[in-house]
UniProtKB/Swiss-Prot annotation:
Its main location: nucleus. GO terms for biological process: female gonad development; forebrain neuron development; forebrain neuron differentiation; learning or memory; odontogenesis of dentin-containing tooth. Residues 96-148, 157-210 form the LIM zinc-binding domain. GO terms for cellular component: female germ cell nucleus. This is LIM/homeobox protein Lhx8. Gene3D superfamilies: Cysteine Rich Protein, Homeodomain-like. It comes from Mus musculus (Mouse).
């Protein structure tokens, strides 16, 4: 917003001298034709209508009101429609572009070659008075305050969607505008630097590494006959931080390799390092693969070949009432004769000789 230049509003006053501060008299008619026709460049200027004897625009001064004269014939129409279509003010009066009434106030506002009452210039969205604002914006003949203009027509970041202000650092890519911090890889979230290669896929920025990964994913799915979209081929932040473990290829053995290892297993199921090295040289396999094969074979052998255990009947509880005290005749003895068991042999001979006497003796519980 700027004040109109003093020389732009010098009025030719009949019967009065043009002051020394103004331009010469012969230049005044040409300037008068520019008073109502010069664009305001999207800014509102507070103008004193008429300048009295001095003929200068002075928003802070006071004087008699005189109309401006023009050297060129002006349109007699003073309706709001004619003013909105770009016509200049008719001689002798100025019409407000908002209410259509003649402006007889001491001050007026001039925006984009149109005249306004100070009270009539307002935002077309929020209806805020712009009489004391330093600037205003025009779009399709509508007046906006700064806030509403940027809300409706301002540039937004293609990543975060927030407004980009004139003081923000930005990066541009294929017509898209990004905040400096928002110009980062979609997959790894790393901010890209100047001169670094990047790709723009469906409005998403990718660094070179993850762009190649996306192409590999698309190629692999096409080869497998699976349909996949570009969105599905993109790696997300979770996939980057927690990648899925790659499946290990299963090791296959030839008949000759199996024959060599099985022959060694029959001799020694837990070979040492030297034997493993010899087997690796003979079979062409790595020591680690052979060692794992022997571990698996030992586990299978231990599982299928277990020591023989005698089968026993399940033990069941018997009520104590059904139990009877054991009798001597129910007990079977087998004599164990060691090499120096002479005394034990004599004892057993004595017990056999007096068996009848023992059978007739009563049995008493031990107290």
């Amino acid at each position: 917003m700027y004040w109109k230049s003093d020389q732009m509003f010098v009025c030719k006053l009949e019967g009065k001298e043009v002051p020394e501060l103004a331009v010469p008299r012969e230049k005044c008619p040409g300037l008068m034709s520019e008073e109502c026709g010069r664009p305001a460049a999207l800014a509102a200027g507070r103008t004193r209508k008429g300048a009295g004897e001095e003929g200068l625009v002075n928003p802070e001064g006071a004087g008699d009101e005189d109309s401006c004269s023009s050297s060129a014939p002006l349109s007699p129409s003073s309706s709001p429609q004619s003013m909105a279509s770009g016509s200049v003010c008719p001689p002798g009066k100025c019409v407000c572009s908002s209410c259509g009434l003649e402006i007889v106030d001491k001050y007026l506002l001039k925006v984009n070659d149109l005249c306004w009452h100070v009270r009539c210039l307002s935002c077309s969205v929020c209806r805020t008075s712009l009489g004391r604002h330093t600037s205003c914006y025009i779009k399709d003949k509508d007046i906006f305050c700064k806030l509403d203009y940027f809300r409706r027509y301002g540039t937004r970041c293609s990543r975060c969607g927030r407004h980009i202000h004139s003081t923000d650092w930005v990066r541009r890519a294929k017509g898209n505008v990004y905040h400096l911090a928002c110009f980062a890889c979609f997959s790894c979230k790393r901010q890209l630097s100047t001169g670094e290669e990047f790709a723009l896929v469906e409005e998403k920025v990718l660094c070179r590494v993850h762009f190649d990964c996306m192409l590999d994913n698309l190629k692999r799915e096409v080869e497998n006959g699976n349909g996949i979209s570009v969105e599905g081929a993109l790696l997300t932040e979770q996939d980057v931080n927690h990648p899925k473990p790659a499946k290990r290829a299963r090791t296959s053995f030839t008949a000759d390799q199996l024959q060599v290892m099985q022959a060694q297993f029959a001799q020694d199921n837990n070979p040492d390092a030297q034997t493993l090295q010899k087997l690796a040289e003979r079979t062409g396999l790595s020591r680690r693969v052979i060692q794992v094969w022997f571990q698996n074979c030992r586990a299978r052998h231990k599982k299928h070949v277990s020591p023989n255990h005698s089968s026993s009947a399940p033990v069941t509880a018997v009520p104590s009432s059904r139990l009877s005290p054991p009798m001597l005749e129910e007990m079977a003895y087998s004599a164990y004769v060691p090499q120096d068991g002479t005394m034990l042999t004599a004892l057993h001979s004595y017990m056999d000789a007096h068996q009848q006497l023992l059978d007739s003796s009563p049995c008493y519980p031990i107290q």
